[in-house]
């Protein structure tokens, strides 16, 4: 089957890889000059299934009001009055109760755990290298309340069979030695030993080369104007004076998916702006061993080979990509506070990107009412964590194979009022 994939970020490229491996003739189209040039370029580097959780959580509405008056707030909102922004925010607020939070986190962890299995299988099969580490993730708590609240997430982890360690502050240095100097500022941490890290852009670029060698065609510097449709199917992709045709089409345009699908499929994917710093390491023993998640500021600090990646924050500001100095100051403040000897902060590279976020936090993966249009978008801050699983899942569904995990509550159909999901089962291993 001829398949066109729109988008060459980590989700688009993994989709191309798995579809090609399933025997399809795949073409990837992107406006950029190469893969992973936008949202996948400089994310936090975490592959953290256990921390997969929606931003829509109990208490967030009240916290958002408090954050409006804080200098280093993890979330910022600038209302633009557009119906899309207001509707998306209202949908997000409706998911900020315990029932929705547990439901959304459960399916996010399910897909994320499966995705890590798929990544391990892919890594073993291809030998791909991307400065990856398998050292686990450590979520740091600065207050007693945060430490106590961890029990809510632990319940989801136990239900999904995810190993964890709840550590008091005196034990944090056992897994991250550099924290010994600052442990007095912390109340404890939640460690997930099976989590991983890696450079998402490096992975995507190298997998794209492997996919190209396997027969995938990449059409870079090719802006897409619109999808052409008639009745119940797509019949082409209009790119300037050219119409590119295929048997099936996969939307993986991230934050730009919603506009491209206007009038075809209504999906609530909104750009959630985030920032990162990439810092050269100066003292290896003063840098993190793996990856840290600061619960207070919602900022991740990740170790690559010779660099530290500091990423986080969320701004609901539309498609604005300005680099704001106060956000840089927040990232610098957190990394100086936790790893003061780690890196040359004054030499850091400052970056921003737009994460494609749904109001319930769960990506949109699967079929649509158009028989040859498929979606793989809306992964929010977890595109790197969920990419391989989403790509394998999409390939299985499109190819008529039975996926290894339940998936109907990942489709766009879940936004229908009459949708009733199949009860999820325990996680299965990835395909051999």
UniProtKB/Swiss-Prot annotation:
EC numbers, comma separated: 1.4.99.-
Q: What InterPro entries does the database record attribute to this sequence?
A: DadA, FAD-dep_OxRdtase, FAD/NAD-bd_sf
The keyword Membrane is assigned to this record: yes
Using the record, list the residue span of the signal peptide; answer none if the entry has no such feature: none
User: Which keywords appear in this protein's UniProt record, sorted alphabetically?
Assistant: Cell inner membrane, Cell membrane, FAD, Flavoprotein, Membrane, Oxidoreductase
Catalyzes what? Answer: a D-alpha-amino acid + A + H2O = a 2-oxocarboxylate + AH2 + NH4(+)
**Principal cellular location given in the protein's record:** membrane
Pathway per the UniProt entry:
Amino-acid degradation; D-alanine degradation; NH(3) and pyruvate from D-alanine: step 1/1
**Binding of FAD: at which residues?**
3-17
Q: Which Pfam families match?
A: DAO
Annotated compartments: Cell inner membrane
- Which cofactors, if any, are listed as required? FAD
Going by the entry's taxonomy, the superkingdom of the source organism is recorded as Bacteria
Q: Which GO terms describe its biological process?
A: D-alanine catabolic process
Q: What GO annotations for molecular function exist for this entry?
A: D-amino-acid dehydrogenase activity
Give the record's GO CC terms: cytoplasm; plasma membrane
Q: How does it sit in the membrane?
A: Peripheral membrane protein
Entry-linked NCBIfam families: PRK00711.1
Give the record's family classification.
Answer: Belongs to the DadA oxidoreductase family.
The UniProt function text for this chain reads:
Oxidative deamination of D-amino acids.
Q: What is this protein called?
A: D-amino acid dehydrogenase
Organism of origin: Salmonella typhimurium (strain LT2 / SGSC1412 / ATCC 700720)
Which gene produces this protein? dadA
């Amino acid at each position: 089957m001829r398949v066109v994939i729109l988008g060459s970020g980590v989700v688009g490229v993994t989709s191309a890889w798995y579809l090609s491996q399933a025997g399809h003739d795949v073409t990837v189209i992107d406006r950029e000059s190469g893969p992973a040039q936008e949202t996948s370029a400089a994310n936090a580097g975490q592959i953290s299934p256990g921390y997969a959780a929606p931003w829509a959580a109990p208490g967030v509405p009240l916290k958002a009001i408090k954050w409006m008056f804080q200098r280093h707030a993890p979330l910022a909102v600038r209302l633009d009055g557009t119906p899309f922004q207001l509707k998306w925010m209202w949908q997000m607020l409706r998911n900020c109760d315990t029932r929705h939070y547990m439901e959304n986190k459960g399916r996010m962890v399910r897909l994320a755990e499966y995705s890590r299995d798929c990544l391990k299988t892919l890594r073993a099969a291809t030998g791909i290298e991307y400065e990856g580490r398998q050292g686990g993730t450590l979520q740091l708590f600065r207050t007693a309340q945060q430490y106590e609240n961890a029990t809510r997430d632990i319940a989801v982890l136990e239900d999904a069979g995810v190993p964890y360690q709840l550590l008091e502050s005196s034990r944090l240095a056992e897994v991250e030695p550099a924290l010994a100097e600052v442990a007095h500022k912390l109340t404890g941490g939640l460690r997930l030993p099976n989590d991983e890290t890696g450079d998402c852009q490096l992975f995507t670029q190298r997998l794209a080369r492997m996919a190209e060698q396997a027969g995938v065609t990449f059409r870079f510097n090719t802006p897409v104007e619109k999808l052409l449709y008639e009745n119940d199917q797509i019949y082409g992709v209009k790119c300037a004076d050219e119409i590119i045709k295929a048997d099936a089409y996969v939307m993986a345009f991230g934050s730009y998916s919603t506009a491209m699908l206007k009038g075809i499929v209504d999906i609530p994917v909104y750009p959630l702006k985030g920032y990162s710093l990439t810092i050269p390491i100066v003292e290896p023993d003063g840098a993190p061993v793996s990856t840290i998640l600061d619960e207070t500021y919602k900022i991740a600090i990740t170790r690559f080979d010779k660099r530290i990646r500091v990423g986080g924050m969320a701004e609901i500001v539309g498609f604005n990509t300005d680099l704001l100095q106060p956000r840089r100051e927040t990232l610098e403040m957190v990394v100086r506070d936790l790893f003061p000897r780690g890196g040359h902060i004054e030499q850091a590279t400052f970056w921003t990107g737009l994460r494609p976020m749904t109001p319930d936090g769960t990506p949109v993966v699967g079929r649509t009412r158009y028989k040859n249009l498929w979606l793989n978008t809306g992964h929010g801050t977890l595109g790197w964590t969920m990419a391989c699983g989403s790509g394998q899942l999409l390939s299985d569904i499109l190819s008529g194979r039975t996926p290894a995990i339940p998936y109907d509550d990942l489709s766009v159909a879940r936004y229908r009022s009459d949708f009733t999901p199949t009860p999820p089962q325990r996680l299965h291993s990835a395909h051999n």
